[in-house]
Regions:
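Amphipathic alpha-helical blocks and their helix-capping loop/short-beta junctions
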Residues: 174-180
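RNase H-like, metal-dependent nuclease domains and their acidic two-metal-ion catalytic environment used
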Residues: 2-150, 158, 180, 184-188, ...
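Surface-exposed intrinsically disordered loops and tails
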Residues: 157-174
Length: 297
């Protein structure tokens, strides 16, 4: 039914039937993950960075549209800071980072990476220590930082830092907020993309995380002693791509359709145009008669 199409079999069972998936059941079907691993996963063409943990599969194309999506480590040493570079048009993973790095250094790294990929839309998860990373991006005056409203009514994907003090933007916050409201949405979006095979994943590290990304007491999270940093960054990226960027594109398309509906050869009735004008500009049809305007000169 419609709920199954939107949320997936597992999501619909939890949402509609209160049938919470048993602990240990993976969020993404392992058979599907194996298909992805056999079909798309490949070694990166380059490994670079101070720790060699930036993996790249594609270099930035001249006219490519990209987004960089990051999940910042909590700072307790048990997880990693991670990010993906996603080609927006085809939802293709072109680069990935996973490592342990200071939040300020990670902020600088994200700005540099986003700039390299054609000033990509930079989306940073802003919970907890993520704010320190975002502040570094703001201090660097990065112009394409993602903002969203606190109540999630809308997102502003074209927000410029020079406008950050405008009164009508006081409720805008930098970064993406993973809350009890947004978390089910982004995980559902992850499941949807994989079920429809609408995203191209190159990273073996990410697929390995997805194999251990399970339902535990009704909540999707990493299995004990494993991490889900790459998974959560991808969840956010797919939601932003499918929601915020799609809405912006629909607005652009609507503008094009509106402008295209305006005809340039329409004739309007009036003093200086329309059917009351004769071929001779000095003659005008008045009622049933043609009057010579030169007599008034």
């Amino acid at each position: 039914d419609e709920q199954t199409r939107i949320l997936g079999v597992k999501g619909a069972s939890q949402e509609c039937d209160c049938d919470f998936v048993g602990s240990g059941d993976t969020v993404i079907d392992p058979i599907l993950l194996t298909w992805y691993k056999d079909t798309y996963v490949m070694d990166p063409v380059e490994k670079r960075g101070f720790d060699g943990n930036l993996w790249r599969w594609e270099y930035p194309a001249a006219n490519g549209s990209y987004m960089v999506v990051a999940d910042v480590a909590r700072g307790d040493g048990s997880d990693y800071s991670a990010c993906h570079v996603i080609e927006v048009t085809n939802a293709t993973q072109v680069a990935e980072y996973k490592g342990k790095v200071d939040t300020k250094d990670f902020g600088n790294f994200l700005v540099n990476l986003s700039t390299e990929y054609n000033d990509a839309l930079l989306v940073v998860e802003n919970s907890n220590i993520g704010w320190a990373c975002i502040q570094q991006c703001i201090d660097r005056d990065y112009k394409n930082l993602f903002y969203m409203s606190k109540d999630l009514k809308y997102v502003d994907v074209e927000h410029q830092m020079k406008n950050k003090y405008r009164a009508d933007e006081k409720q805008m916050v930098a970064g993406f907020s993973t809350t009890s409201k947004t978390r089910p949405l982004i995980i559902s979006k992850l499941d949807e993309y994989f079920r429809e095979k609408a995203v191209t994943i190159r990273s073996n590290r990410l697929i390995d995380e997805l194999f251990t990304f399970i339902f535990m007491n009704g909540r999707a999270e990493a299995m004990k002693s494993y991490n889900d940093d790459l998974v959560m960054a991808l969840c956010i990226g797919l939601w932003v791509r499918d929601t915020a960027l799609r809405l912006r594109q629909e607005g652009i398309d609507l503008t094009k359709r509106t402008l295209g509906g305006i005809s340039s050869n329409q004739q309007y009735e009036g003093v200086y145009g329309g059917s009351n004008m004769d071929d001779n500009p000095w003659k005008m049809k008045i009622g049933d008669d043609i009057e010579d305007l030169t007599q008034w000169l």
